[in-house]
Amino acid sequence: MALYQEQSLKLYNSMSGEKETFTPINEGNVGMYVCGPTVYSNVHLGNCRTFMSFDLVFRYLKHLGYKVRYVRNITDAGHLENDADSGEDRIAKKARLEQIEPMEVVQKYTVDFHNILNKFNNYPPSIEPTATGHIVEQIEIIKTILDNGFAYEANGSVYFDVVKFNKEHSYGKLSGRAIEDMIANTRELSAQSDKRSPQDFALWKKAEPQHIMRWPSPWSDGFPGWHLECTVMSTKYLGEEFDIHGGGMDLKFPHHECEIAQGEAATGKSPVNYWLHANMLTLNGKKMAKSTGNFILPEQIFTGNNEVLTKAFSPNVVRFFVLQAHYRSILDFSSDALLGSEKGFNRLMDAYRSIEELPASDKSDFNLSEWKQSCYDAMNDDFNSPILIAKLFDAVKTINGIKDGSIQITDTDKEEFKATMSAFMFDILGLIDAASENKNEGDKLAGTIELLIKLRADARNNKDFALSDQIRDRLQEIGIQLKDGKEGTSFSVK
């Protein structure tokens, strides 16, 4: 029996505003789509929090035994400034300012994005499609929406008709906005606008002469609207109806609202069963955002090169800090908060490493199964990582109790205890036992040096003193000191 058949997972569905029991469309299989980055600059920590949150979701679903297809896109075209239907493409603007090709911008910041998430120990998605790789599919879905009567062409651009759509469906149901209120609170369209209503949004935009990112279409040489790519890529790889759609809270409106409208207009079906939204990271009490300059880059945290930091912090500690808050809660970033997380992280790791040396008894008075289920209960409650971490610190108290003899545990329970700690700390939370990794690296280094010492000894025995001295000198250059003695050669690392 798979774990998912034993555990009852509940998700907070943004559509209903309630926690709901998770039941995938196809038993044992999960389709999950998460909106990825627009790759025109380095990702900041606020962006990374969202992706760490959905990495936790991905990891736990896999742990439960689900076969998960996780799709996360790369936006490499069509995202205009201020998330609007007019203005300059963000990537094209960056290319113009740096005097390079747009795809050079895309390549540079996609590589940076992957490198940063790798440092945070995020699993890669199953599929990572790009907007520019799906232009044909985006044109085809626009044709379908036009044929179904929910869009119109104007001067080479195509717009989604929100008012007409709302007569048969419900635009605004995810964000809880009534279209009447939206109309009342929106300025009138300018005389130059091709839209019928201010709420309408672009499915295809005719490119201005200076717009260098353009593709041919039945309507004009132009580019797809930002909202369209996610509808196309999610449904292409997950089907017209799929299980989970995730993203930052700031994408709920208009991006996700528009995705729902496009999907329903094209297929008549609501595309997503569970909508999950991760909350923001704040700095100085305000939302972390590039547009306001109120952000911090991960590399600045790793090096300590930012005025808000008192020292550098490892990716491991930053991940632990992020997961100490529930993904739907606002999290405020500060150096003091990271210092607290670092202490907690080290305490947890030290306790885990000591399990192997715990004294075993003939009987256990530690209720292992109850504690283990409490860890699952935390994750089953909408991926409640802070409660899970609290349960792991309960385990630290138990470990200390076993050390001082106030709690007993058998060898069998000790093995299961360690395996359970490992599963929740490393497989699910995605933490890394850096000391163990460093020890493994240290063992590899020691083995390599011992081999060089042997080669040096062979050279000396063969009276090849030039090679012997070269090995000694090169090791010394990289901080490894050899010391010859009666018992042989030893080494120390400076």
From Swiss-Prot:
What one GO molecular function would you report for this record? Answer: cysteine-tRNA ligase activity
GO cellular component assignments: cytosol
How the cofactor binds, per note?
Binds 1 zinc ion per subunit.
Residue ranges annotated as motif 'KMSKS' region: 287-291
Q: What is its EC number?
A: 6.1.1.16
Signal peptide residues on this chain, from the entry's feature table: none
Can you state which reaction this protein catalyses? tRNA(Cys) + L-cysteine + ATP = L-cysteinyl-tRNA(Cys) + AMP + diphosphate
According to its UniProt record, this protein's enzyme class is ligase
Q: Could you tell me where this protein is found in the cell?
A: Cytoplasm
SUPFAM superfamilies, A to Z: Anticodon-binding domain of a subclass of class I aminoacyl-tRNA synthetases, Nucleotidylyl transferase
Q: Which residues bind Zn(2+)?
A: 35, 230, 255, 259
What are the record keywords, sorted?
Aminoacyl-tRNA synthetase, ATP-binding, Cytoplasm, Ligase, Metal-binding, Nucleotide-binding, Protein biosynthesis, Zinc
State a single Pfam family of this protein: tRNA-synt_1e
The UniProt subunit note reads as follows:
Monomer.
Name the record gives this protein = Cysteine--tRNA ligase
Originating organism: Christiangramia forsetii (strain DSM 17595 / CGMCC 1.15422 / KT0803)
